[in-house]
């Protein structure tokens, strides 16, 4: 008799755990937010849909397994703070600095000369021209803020999916925590 009760308790414990946790989340006890400190896009999107001007290769290659911090520049004065912050976040990763790539996208021909100056100022940054502006359109549709006005930093995972962006008011230390808790860094100070 004791063995049957013990066996029943062992067999029912996992079922009860799953049942109670499901009920806990179903009846409104789920967490309100996430700890990523960013804002998820309405729908994540793959970057392999964006091609270069000749339509023969991807706008960005993701074969190196690096996380990507990006800014879409529409106004150089608005975006310079985001570009500088990307550099500071990259430097703050210390020995994991090579696990992150920084990319600046733009489509306005009037910014060509400013992009050359930007490349001189930040030599390790990759600058990509989105000739037809389709990336900007997709960013606008999938976000809750105006990418044209704000020029925020957005994150692309190593598989080529744009998953989140950061509001311009987000504390840089919180952004760094996301990079530390992802595969972009080995040591986690957060």
Residue ranges and their predicted role:
Residues 71, 102-105, 155:
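Structural beta-sheet core signal
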Residues 77, 81-121:
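Structural microenvironment flanking redox-active thiols in thiol-disulfide oxidoreductases
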Residues 135-176:
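Thiol/disulfide oxidoreductase modules built on the thioredoxin-like
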Residues 180-185:
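Conserved small/polar residues in nucleotide/adenosyl-binding loops
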Residues 62-78:
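Short active-site neighborhood of thiol/selenol oxidoreductases, capturing the structured segment around
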Residues 103, 115-150:
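Short, internal strand/loop/helix patches
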Residues 1-51:
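N-terminal targeting signals for export/organelle localization
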